[in-house]
Amino acid sequence: MKKKLLAGAITLLSVATLAACSKGSEGADLISMKGDVITEHQFYEQVKNNPSAQQVLLNMTIQKVFEKQYGSELDDKEVDDTIAEEKKQYGENYQRVLSQAGMTLETRKAQIRTSKLVELAVKKVAEAELTDEAYKKAFDEYTPDVTAQIIRLNNEDKAKEVLEKAKAEGADFAQLAKDNSTDEKTKENGGEITFDSASTEVPEQVKKAAFALDVDGVSDVITATGTQAYSSQYYIVKLTKKTEKSSNIDDYKEKLKTVILTQKQNDSTFVQSIIGKELQAANIKVKDQAFQNIFTQYIGGGDSSSSSSTSNE
């Protein structure tokens, strides 16, 4: 699951409840035994230096800050729709997937909501930066729709064999795709797919190769990163249709806006800067030295800023 803003290793409840214990109190007993107990405060002192606990506290802070600032602008239906999509994707395994990630349905909903609140904030800032220069840059880099047939394979030697057949005179590329491609979404349609430079359906290497082809041209074997770590997949592409790019930028204005905003959402540095600004505006104050550095990736040292200061008040 993408964009995990809430950690699952330690529950939000444990850190939230234990952090509320005053320093002068042991709090309630969590465990009792013959001749001894383990109190909330004792447990808190043990877990607060754990990186997972610190990540949870960071995520809780982000959640609260963004909920206060943008919560009224986010419809719960957006969260419910995402949950519905995940349930459809994972089917009867959904609860098991959540459990393996250390989450319940409710904590997953909270995670998704926080992620969408951050996306909303990023979108607002990005829209304010939609300058003519940004549009021109996006236009220069944009390639409109092409239609191609693709064959995806998991073995390079097999890909070379199929390529030889694909480049033979009179080759039926569509049939080769049906017989050999591992791409279940396109193989039954002869490998046909339409995409532009902003599409995410095919790897960047495949798009680049396709855009360089003439109509009816067939690429060499293209190596692209696979879906599993350290794996590769191999593509053969035949270009069947090419759209001429208009010289009028206004013809693509809405598309270019989407491209620019998507790039901003995927720019981790930009996203971190937005989170940092919101945290600073919220005047974050760290009350326990154990957590003084949890905001450094967003707003620098936890004890070096008045908006993210360590305090024992």
From Swiss-Prot:
GO biological process: protein folding
Keywords carried by this UniProt record: Cell membrane, Isomerase, Lipoprotein, Membrane, Palmitate, Rotamase, Signal
Molecular function via GO: peptidyl-prolyl cis-trans isomerase activity
Signal sequence annotation: 1-20
Predominant localisation class: membrane
Pfam family, one: Rotamase
Keyword Signal included in the entry's annotation: yes
Lipidation (N-palmitoyl cysteine): C21
Function recorded in the entry: Plays a major role in protein secretion by helping the post-translocational extracellular folding of several secreted proteins.
Family: Belongs to the PrsA family.
Xref: NCBIfam families: PRK01326.1
Name of the protein in question: Foldase protein PrsA
